[in-house]
C-alpha cells in the first residue's frame, strides 16, 4: 500500500478533525470546514455509521496522524497488546516514541511528514550517531540533535520558532540554540494531545 500524497486538508475533513498534517502557521479550521466532508458540497449520508464503521474510521484517523501504513500499524497493535497495562495507551505510547514523531514534537519539523523526511535524509543524530529510520523507537534519556550540516536549513529554524511560540510537550526538553532535544520520558496518556479514542481501535482488533 502506497503512502497517500494527495491534499492533506481532504484527509482532515474526512475525519472531521485537524490531523496536524500541515504546518501549524495557521489553524486548519480557519482554512476549511472540518465538519464538511470532502466533495463539492460535502458528502452526506442518511444512514447512521455502524459501530464497526466508527472503529475503522478511528483506526484510519490514527494511522494518518502518525503516517503509519496498515501492516506496520498491526505490528504496533500486536506489541501494545503483548505489553502489560492498557493496550490502547500502550499503542499511543509506541507511536509517540517513533523517531519521526519525537523530531516533530521537538519542533525540528513543522509536520510529521517533514520530520520523517529529515530523518530519512540523515539530518538527525540520536546520541551522537546518525539514525535514518523514522520508525526507530526512542528511549528515555535519548538525545536528538540536528546534524551540523543541516542546521542551516531555513525550514528547521522556522519550525523551531513556531514550536517555541506554541510550547513543547512536557516529556521533551529542547535547547533551540543548540538544535538539540532530550526525550525525557514516554508520555502518559493524559499528556498525548489529539482527539483520539483508542478504545475503538482496541475493540476493532478484538473482533
Swiss-Prot record:
Polar residues compositional bias, start-end: 42-53
InterPro entries in the record: Ribosomal_uS4 (IPR022801), Ribosomal_uS4_bac-type (IPR005709), Ribosomal_uS4_CS (IPR018079), Ribosomal_uS4_N (IPR001912), S4_RNA-bd (IPR002942), S4_RNA-bd_sf (IPR036986)
Cross-referenced Pfam families: Ribosomal_S4, S4
Annotated GO CC locations: small ribosomal subunit
GO BP term, example: translation
SMART domains referenced in this protein's UniProt entry, alphabetically: Ribosomal_S4 (SM01390), S4 (SM00363)
Disordered: annotated span: 30-54
Domain S4 RNA-binding: 97-160
Top-rank taxon: Bacteria
PROSITE patterns, per the entry: RIBOSOMAL_S4, S4
Alphabetic keyword roster: Ribonucleoprotein, Ribosomal protein, RNA-binding, rRNA-binding
Molecular function terms, GO-annotated: rRNA binding; structural constituent of ribosome
Function: One of the primary rRNA binding proteins, it binds directly to 16S rRNA where it nucleates assembly of the body of the 30S subunit.
Family statement drawn from the similarity comment of this UniProt entry: Belongs to the universal ribosomal protein uS4 family.
Subunit structure and binding partners: Part of the 30S ribosomal subunit. Contacts protein S5. The interaction surface between S4 and S5 is involved in control of translational fidelity.
Protein name listed in UniProt: Small ribosomal subunit protein uS4
Upper lineage: Bacteria, Pseudomonadati, Pseudomonadota, Betaproteobacteria, Burkholderiales
Amino acid at each position: 500500500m502506497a503512502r497517500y500524497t494527495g491534499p492533506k486538508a481532504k484527509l482532515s475533513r474526512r475525519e472531521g478533525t485537524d490531523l496536524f498534517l500541515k504546518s501549524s502557521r495557521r489553524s486548519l479550521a480557519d482554512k476549511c470546514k472540518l465538519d464538511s466532508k470532502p466533495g463539492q458540497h460535502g458528502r452526506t449520508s442518511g444512514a447512521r455509521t455502524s459501530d464497526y464503521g466508527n472503529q475503522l474510521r478511528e483506526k484510519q484517523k490514527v494511522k494518518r496522524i502518525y503516517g503509519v501504513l496498515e501492516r506496520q500499524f498491526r505490528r504496533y497493535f500486536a506489541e501494545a497488546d503483548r505489553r502489560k497495562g492498557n493496550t490502547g495507551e500502550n499503542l499511543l505510547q509506541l507511536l509517540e516514541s517513533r523517531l519521526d514523531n519525537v523530531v516533530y514534537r521537538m519542533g525540528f519539523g513543522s509536520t510529521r511528514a517533514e520530520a520523517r523526511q529529515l530523518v530519512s535524509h540523515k539530518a538527525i543524530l540520536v546520541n551522537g550517531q546518525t539514525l535514518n529510520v523514522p520508525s526507530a523507537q526512542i528511549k528515555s534519556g535519548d538525545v536528538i540533535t540536528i546534524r551540523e550540516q543541516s542546521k542551516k536549513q531555513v525550514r528547521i529554524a522556522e519550525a523551531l520558532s513556531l514550536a517555541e511560540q506554541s510550547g513543547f510537550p512536557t516529556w521533551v526538553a529542547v535547547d533551540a540554540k543548540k538544535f538539540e532535544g532530550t526525550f525525557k520520558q514516554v508520555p502518559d496518556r493524559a499528556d498525548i494531545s489529539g482527539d483520539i479514542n483508542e478504545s475503538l481501535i482496541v475493540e476493532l482488533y478484538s473482533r
